[in-house]
Amino acid sequence: MQNNKNKETLEIYVLGDDFKYYENLKYLPLTSYPSNIQSALIVYSLRGTAKISVHEDVHWIQPDELIILLPGQFVSFSEPSEDFLTVTMVISSSMFGDALSGVPRFSPHFFFYMRSHYYYPQNERDVLRIYNYLGMIKDKVMSTDAYRRELIIHLLRYLYLELFNAYEKESMLVNTRKDTRKEELANKFFSLIMKHFKENKDVAFYADKLCITSKYLTMVIKIGRAHV
């Protein structure tokens, strides 16, 4: 991908309803008030600043910063500066699920971790890597390859694995814990959320799927948060 810091023309490339790639996007496809997002977003800030909140964490986006948002998070976006521009990818919940399906085991604690670890400042070396990475994805979206969806999924999976690897390293420094019955339930709970969060947001629905009470599931979720 060419350096677009001095270009302002908005470019949009799509892959059906699954994937949208925006170059030089100023206003992120988010509301100015906290709302539950249905898609995953990967945002790279080219220049300028803007305010973003994920759950209760507020952050001012800076130039050369990578923002990672996951489906189901409560997010708001506001106050972009006059010169704010981004490269933004919007990934459907279906495609996001397919990207994670190739990962051996995503701990549910990772999703809590990402509530406060969603922005990543990039150094000079990182910026070159990010431009190469974004360029590969853009090339695949624009191509006529028969398996371009699968190729994009693999590229997305690479990024999510890098994030999960960083999370695991940090977790190991804090605690070396074995899987327990509660953690196994938490894993299953988050798998169900990925499948059903659009149509079901009631704890009772997930408790019924797991054959436990709503009260016990709430306790399991609280324990998961305590580990993050």
Which residues make up each language-model segment?
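Short beta-strand His + acidic residue motifs that chelate non-heme Fe in jelly-roll/DSBH
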Residues: 51-53, 75-81
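Short, Lys/Arg-enriched, Trp-marked, Pro/Gly-tolerant hinge/linker segments that flank
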Residues: 121-122, 144-151, 161-191, 195-210, ...
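Amphipathic, well-ordered alpha-helical segments in soluble domains
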Residues: 41-44, 129-133, 155, 159-162
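Generic protein-terminus/edge-of-domain signal
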Residues: 1-62
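Short hydrophobic/aromatic patch on the recognition helix
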Residues: 64, 217-218
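Conserved metal-binding segment of the jelly-roll/cupin
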Residues: 61-74, 90
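A hydrophobic/aromatic-rich effector-binding and dimerization subdomain
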Residues: 2-14, 80-139
